[in-house]
């Protein structure tokens, strides 16, 4: 048998081995995407592609359709957690670190069939922060484009371990949310139903030309108020890193920032100083 035939057979077998975990997810508006069983009673799918639904239908490999509730969402990591009745499944081991040019199999599900493709890993980079402030443990992209139905698909390493979940990058390339990032989000969503975000408690406006953010308002009782920030202060640094826009501040108020103490570089009346602030949890509602 040729190398290509061996590779083809191995990829098909791998997709078949994990098929029982792969589901199709259909929102109330009819849009369809993929997901996978994380553990008994829990399915992971792509948060943004799911849309603003409170419940969804989940289609399993045997054709069974089950109503699911949205147990929680984390837009910052693009993870949505669905709660429903599922069979017992073994824990899905996370893959070891993947390498550029290694292979992975993307496995999703349509209404009547499994959807799978073999892809190379085109990029592996360091941890990064999403546009919504989420801490993503590695930048992994695949050399394939996603369809709407394969958003939320599982990305599987050759040994059957889970690389992560496929979501769409700006050019519809498959960007992978790593299994370790998903595990962190699932733990928090299972416990709280949401992912807490850091809270500073200020209204900010850009100063211009990437030179900081000026404080236009301070909420009573907020971490900023307790630390002594005042209207008119210009925040120039955050833990020593330059603040170039209001978005720089917002993105740093991620899930892991709650109860952390940060040092802000501040200009007040032309004088520079440092102010320590212990961040709170952003109020909900």
What are these language model-derived features?
Residues 19-21, 80-91, 115-172, 179, ...:
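Active-site region of chymotrypsin-like
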Residues 1-5, 103, 116, 158, ...:
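Interdomain regulatory linker/hinge segments that flank or connect interaction modules
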Residues 31, 141, 145, 188-252, ...:
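PDZ/PDZ-like groove recognition
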Residues 2-3, 22-115, 139-140, 148-149, ...:
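Conserved active-site neighborhood of the chymotrypsin/trypsin-like protease fold
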Residues 8-11, 15, 118, 179-186, ...:
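Extracytoplasmic/secreted envelope proteins and their assembly/folding machinery
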Residues 40-43, 157-163, 232:
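Short, glycine-anchored, charge-dense loop/turn motifs used at functional sites
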Residues 55, 161, 181, 223, ...:
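Residue-level recognition of oxygen-bearing side chains
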Residues 38-39, 157-158, 239, 268:
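A cytosolic small-molecule/anion-sensing beta-strand core signal
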């Amino acid at each position: 048998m040729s190398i290509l035939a061996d590779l083809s057979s191995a990829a098909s077998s791998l997709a078949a081995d994990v098929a029982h975990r792969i589901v199709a997810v259909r929102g109330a508006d009819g849009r369809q995407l993929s997901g996978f069983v994380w553990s008994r009673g829990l399915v992971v799918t792509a948060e943004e592609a799911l849309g603003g639904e409170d419940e969804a239908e989940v289609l399993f490999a045997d054709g069974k359709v089950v109503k699911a509730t949205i147990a929680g969402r984390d837009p910052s990591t693009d993870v949505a957690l669905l709660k429903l009745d599922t069979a017992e499944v073994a824990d899905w081991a996370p893959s070891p670190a993947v390498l550029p040019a290694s292979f992975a199999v993307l496995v999703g599900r349509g209404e009547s069939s499994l959807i799978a493709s073999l892809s190379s890993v085109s990029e592996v980079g360091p941890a990064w922060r999403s546009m919504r402030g989420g801490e993503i443990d590695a930048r992994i992209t695949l050399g394939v484009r996603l369809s709407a139905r394969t958003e939320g698909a599982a990305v599987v390493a050759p040994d059957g371990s889970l690389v992560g979940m496929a979501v769409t990058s700006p050019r519809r390339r498959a960007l992978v949310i790593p299994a370790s990032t998903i595990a962190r989000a699932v733990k928090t969503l299972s416990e709280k139903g949401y992912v807490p975000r850091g809270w500073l408690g200020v209204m900010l406006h850009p100063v211009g030309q990437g030179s900081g953010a000026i404080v236009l308002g301070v909420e009573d009782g907020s971490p900023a108020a307790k630390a002594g920030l005042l209207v008119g202060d210009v925040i120039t640094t955050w833990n020593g890193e330059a603040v170039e826009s209001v978005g720089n501040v917002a993105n740093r108020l991620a899930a892991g920032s709650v109860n952390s103490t940060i040092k802000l570089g501040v200009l007040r009346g032309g004088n520079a100083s440092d102010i320590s602030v212990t961040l709170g949890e952003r109020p909900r509602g």
